């Protein structure tokens, strides 16, 4: 982790790309998707829901729990627990085999989960509530969301797009547009990938 290559950015550079398009000389770090455990725990952390208690019994229904994903109960014989299906959807290795490196897949079911699952809807609601507690107006809330999720401030274009989206909502419920906006941000590649 202390090597110069490991600490490199994933930022694209035209000159370097023209010389080494496949990045064999490691002129930048290749973006990599977070594993399902880190991603789920990050979602709970940014929504201020993560239960950081150490130890205790494993959890059979991890999508209904606020415990760290480390405590998910998994089965070595198949789909015995709800956690098995959720974790496998995002490339958790099979418990029946030794796996030296996890595969990384991008399949439609993952995106359907991000758009439609009760788990993601609840995280979006919790993020919306947190942003309304911690910031006074939409501009401040957008800035806070970007700092929580991406560890940076939004660009002017991102800020304007967010304000436009939130002001264009026809919903009478104050939090609903924020839930939708938060769900989009939490489902973004920038949140799911280490850059």
Predicted ranges, named:
Residues 145, 161-162, 177:
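Amphipathic alpha-helical segments in structured regions that serve as interaction surfaces
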Residues 26-27, 167, 176:
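Compositionally biased amphipathic helical and low-complexity segments enriched in hydrophobic
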Residues 160-169:
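Amphipathic alpha-helical segments that form the core helices of the histone-fold
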Residues 5-7, 11-149, 153, 185-195:
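An acidic, gly/pro-interrupted, aromatic-rich
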Residues 181:
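Globin-like tetrapyrrole-binding proteins
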Residues 137-138, 171-177:
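Short, charged, surface-exposed loops that flank catalytic or proteolytic processing sites
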Residues 1-2:
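Short, functionally critical alpha-helical segments immediately adjacent to catalytic or ligand/cofactor-binding
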């Amino acid at each position: 982790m202390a090597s110069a290559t490991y600490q490199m950015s994933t930022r694209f550079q035209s000159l370097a790309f023209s010389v080494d398009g496949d990045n064999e000389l490691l002129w930048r770090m290749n973006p990599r998707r977070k594993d399902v455990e880190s991603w789920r725990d990050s979602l709970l952390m940014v929504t201020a829901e993560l239960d950081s208690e150490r130890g205790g019994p494993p959890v059979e229904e991890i999508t209904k729990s606020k415990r760290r994903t480390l405590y998910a109960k998994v089965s070595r014989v198949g789909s015995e627990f709800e956690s098995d299906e959720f974790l496998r959807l995002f490339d958790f290795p099979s418990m029946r085999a030794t796996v030296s490196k996890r595969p990384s897949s991008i399949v439609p079911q993952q995106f359907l989960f991000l758009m439609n699952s009760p788990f993601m809807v609840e995280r979006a609601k919790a993020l919306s509530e947190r942003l309304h507690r911690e910031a006074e107006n939409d501009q401040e809330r957008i800035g806070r969301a970007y700092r929580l999720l991406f560890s940076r401030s939004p660009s002017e274009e991102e800020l304007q797009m967010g304000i436009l989206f939130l002001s264009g909502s026809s919903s009478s419920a104050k939090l609903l547009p924020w839930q939708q906006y938060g769900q989009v941000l939490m489902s973004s590649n920038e949140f799911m990938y280490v850059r």
